[in-house]
Amino acid sequence: DLSVRGAYVDETRLYGNFTSLALAVQGQENQAIKAELICPQDFYEVNGVEVSLATALAEKMHQQAEQTIYQLTADNYEQLTDSPFEIAEQDEFWFDVKSGENTIAHRFVISGVHHSDLERLETDLSKICQSYVDWLGDTPFDDYLFMTMATSSDYGGLEHLASTSLITPRDDLPTFFEQAEPSESYQRFLGLCSHEYFHAWWVKTVRPEVFLNANFNQETYTTLLWVFEGFTSYVDDFMLQKSGVISQHSYLKLLAEQINRYYQTHGRALQSVAESSFDAWIKLYRSDENTANAGISYYNKGALVALCLDFALINHGKRIFDVIKVFYDKAKAQDNRRFGMTDANLDDVMNECLPKDVWQDFNAKYIDGTTELPLFELLSEQGVSIEQKDDDITWGMKYMSEPTGLKVQRVVRNSQAAAAGISANDVIVAIDGLKASEKWLKSTAKTQTISEDPAVCHVFRRDELLVLEVPPVSDAHVKQPQTWMLSIVNEKKVNVWMQI
């Protein structure tokens, strides 16, 4: 499993999460643990390169009988399973972050083939990390490790107590020709680093109460993932501009991508963001071609709920960053530096920051309900203009051209294609008697706006031929997704919003 969730071994790399490698001994989960990684000398001699160990655990190494043995120690089973390791050829750099009178060491290691400008990455990443510590006051860790694997196209990250494990397309890493303003692909990697780094405070330290002593034998459910992943998905890109690594203009482009994704998800009218949080195990991580029609992502909508909540708080002299800081301070007051959030104590904090009726109305409409988020109204109040650019999603379906015709990938709920009975994985071979092609599809759809006649499609579903009629567009069909672009019209208001 090459992902950040499991374990992986080949002749160049040993990687593992102890959740995949070490069973808990019932009743002894809180005892100190020693784990040994025994590597045969052959592993080091395959490519004749120097390899290193990366892990947030305390470690020692010694040689014995043609073997290299790494001894890792953890205070308990939780720390062991929350500290992945990698042994591989690695490039690395270190940087320090100031935390009051203290200096917090940060290590970044990267494996896999890459040709990236690590000096540029060090400069940018150190600014981002420093911005978090300046805001939150200190760190919940003594030192921190970024562990990254570069591949051709894989993407993901997983937060841990004092580290994060990342996998990224090598094209997302900074080049030696990177402009002062990071490229969109490099911004994506910085956003990933920012997201997982913030989780050290906002998931590992402050977390849903049901996660404090989670049972590893089963899934643990909560309706609060919109708070933890949603707030993080708002804060991660926000901190890129707050740190000065990207411009306000670039940040608005990233925010527009979130907004576009939200409006292209028709399931937002059917599922609340709280329900989406609860369904993470059974729906979000088992998505299919109908997911966008049936539900909403607590990452995506959660980020935009956080944006709207931040604007509501601004109107009452507070920020969402104040709310997060209140919970982090509660965690620091605990002996184990952990705090469990519940719906009740979230209400308590929000009622201190907002009038009670404002919070109750917001919660009922946008968190527990499916009322459309007032994004454009609120952005306009903060000095941001919104321009609309129509997307030509013909008949309300995503498709790809193949030699046999047009293969349908996804059908939008209540669209013309849905009304005709077209489904994902259908192959449209002919439209109105002519071979189906993207050009002919668009021409037919354009003609329908004038003639208002149905289009006759010959469609293969598996090996069965169907004849389906696609009606002309009408008010009964859902308005197709659109692209929104944001720009600054009032710099003074925007500057107030984009500071903490």
What are these regions (language model features)?
Residues 43, 136-140, 196-205, 209, ...:
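A generic secondary-structure signal for well-formed alpha-helical elements
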Residues 1-130, 134-141, 154, 171:
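Non-catalytic architectural context of zinc metalloproteases
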Residues 28, 114, 118-125, 183-191, ...:
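Solvent-exposed, acidic/flexible segments
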Residues 143-148, 209-215, 244-255, 320-323:
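Short, glycine/acidic-rich hinge or "gate" loops at secondary-structure transitions
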